[in-house]
């Protein structure tokens, strides 16, 4: 993953009912969600704030959101009371609601990179196949994703489903013959049905806004549109029925574009035990089976994760090269940097073992800890190698004798500096509450790397130094 999940003390729940569902029906589902959190999770949930008619998928009567505020972290000690655990239980229970989709999800660690944790997948109509073909491809992809519950969970479209729409068609030739302009037609429709701001007026010392709109009872039915009138160029009032026809159609309530092309967003998460990289690779594999002309791309945190994942090998390689060149310039030797850099993998092994044991993910903070361990591992080796080099050059001792003396004399400084650093990152490794995800990712990785680099370096650095010196001497 790009960033670890954080317990921010609040998470979201999105409610999506079938297209055409009324606001009252949506409210009943919101009430069920609220009752669940306040009764079943009363030990962890402080309050629930619901919004009817709005969600991240769009504004509609069949959409809703619930903002769940958790109690302070000191009152929710233990992994079973974390936001992640509460969300997991909510998915199991709220998934039983048959009247619509109820999807609890955590907020991203960086809000600017998306609206939810997991991946953001854009399905794109690259060949102009049309809305129906894109919808069919989306449903096909969702069906294939549902067949992999061990790798993918909560795979869902992030948008509003097609619904009934009232389409008003204007016969421009008739309107022109009657002396009615299109701008007047649009203005009349906008004012009567949506309302138009006119001006302000002062009422008892307060500024109030004036809006013009048809009364509710005159804009409730499709037939009410035919009763609207627009003024023609010669001043006559012309009814809409004279130049318009209307009928019901079925279509998308909003236009979605990605890089200028028709698209549909799909969100989802990796199943427990599956890395986000594997989940994203599986989605790409499934998308490759869709009809020709349907493409895909990543957005939000998934896009950043793809970029950072591709850069990680180069970043580690550059770190190795920079450390090696600095050591070569410092000691004016090629053998010493080689013997020092051979110790770095020992620290990396510790980082990987610690991350595996404590179920840490390969995120950007893990990479920070990994790069830090490279430098710290080299530091321990330098303490031994530099002293052995001085004994060989200034006192004329043999490579084995100088190395053994260096190990004995530098053991205490190695242990002291390493122990100081391990204790320094210990608060990061054991932290909980706000920001603990990022702190754990750095602290656990660096701590594991320092433990392995310290314990193994004492035994392996002398061996590496002796072997490399003899090889270069030979």
Please provide the spans of the model-predicted regions.
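Surface-exposed amphipathic alpha-helical segments in non-transmembrane regions
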Residues: 12, 25-50, 60-164, 173-299, ...
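Signature of alpha-helical transmembrane segments and their immediate interfacial
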Residues: 1-2, 408
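Membrane-helix entry/capping segments
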Residues: 293-315, 358, 364, 436
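Hydrophobic transmembrane alpha-helices and their membrane-interface caps
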Residues: 325-410, 415-434, 448-452, 456-459, ...
């Amino acid at each position: 993953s790009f960033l670890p999940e954080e317990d921010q003390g609040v998470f979201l729940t999105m409610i999506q009912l079938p297209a055409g569902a009324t606001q009252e029906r949506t409210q009943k589902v919101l009430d069920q969600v609220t009752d669940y959190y306040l009764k079943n999770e009363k030990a962890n949930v402080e309050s629930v704030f619901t919004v009817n008619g709005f969600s991240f998928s769009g504004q509609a009567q069949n959409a809703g959101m619930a903002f769940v505020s958790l109690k302070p972290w000191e009152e929710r000690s233990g992994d079973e009371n974390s936001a992640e655990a509460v969300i997991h239980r909510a998915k199991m229970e709220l998934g039983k609601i048959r009247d619509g989709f109820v999807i609890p999800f955590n907020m991203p660690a960086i809000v600017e990179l998306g609206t939810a944790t997991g991946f953001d997948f854009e399905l794109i109509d690259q060949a102009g196949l049309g809305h129906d073909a894109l919808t069919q491809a989306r449903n096909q992809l969702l069906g294939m994703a549902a067949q992999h519950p061990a790798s993918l969970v909560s795979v869902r479209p992030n948008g509003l489903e097609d619904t009934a729409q009232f389409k008003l068609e204007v016969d421009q030739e008739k309107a022109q013959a009657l002396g009615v302009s299109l701008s007047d037609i649009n203005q009349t429709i906008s004012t009567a049905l949506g309302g138009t701001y006119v001006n302000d007026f002062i009422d008892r010392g307060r500024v109030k806004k004036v809006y013009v709109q048809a009364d509710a009872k005159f804009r409730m039915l499709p037939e009410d549109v035919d009763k609207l009138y627009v003024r023609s160029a010669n001043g006559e009032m012309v009814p809409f029925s004279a130049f318009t026809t209307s009928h019901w159609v079925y279509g998308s309530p909003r236009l979605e574009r990605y890089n200028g092309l028709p698209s549909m967003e799909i969100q989802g998460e990796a199943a427990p035990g599956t890395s986000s990289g594997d989940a994203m690779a599986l989605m790409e594999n499934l998308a490759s089976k869709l009809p020709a002309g349907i493409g895909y791309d990543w957005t939000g945190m998934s896009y950043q994760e793809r970029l950072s994942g591709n850069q990680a090998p180069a970043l580690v390689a550059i770190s190795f090269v920079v450390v090696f060149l600095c050591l070569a310039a410092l000691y004016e030797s090629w053998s010493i940097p080689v013997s020092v850099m051979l110790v770095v993998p020992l620290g990396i092994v510790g980082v990987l073992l610690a991350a595996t044991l404590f179920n840490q993910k390969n995120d950007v903070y893990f990479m920070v800890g990994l790069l830090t361990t490279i430098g710290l591992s080299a530091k321990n080796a330098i303490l031994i190698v530099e002293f052995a080099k001085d004994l060989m050059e200034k006192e004329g001792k043999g490579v084995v004798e100088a190395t053994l003396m260096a190990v004995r004399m530098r053991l205490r400084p190695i242990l002291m500096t390493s122990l100081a650093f391990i204790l320094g990152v210990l608060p990061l490794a054991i932290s909980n509450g706000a920001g603990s995800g990022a702190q754990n990712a750095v602290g656990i990785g660096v701590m594991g790397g320092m433990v392995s680099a310290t314990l193994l370096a004492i035994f392996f650095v002398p061996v590496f130094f002796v072997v490399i010196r003899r090889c270069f001497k030979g």
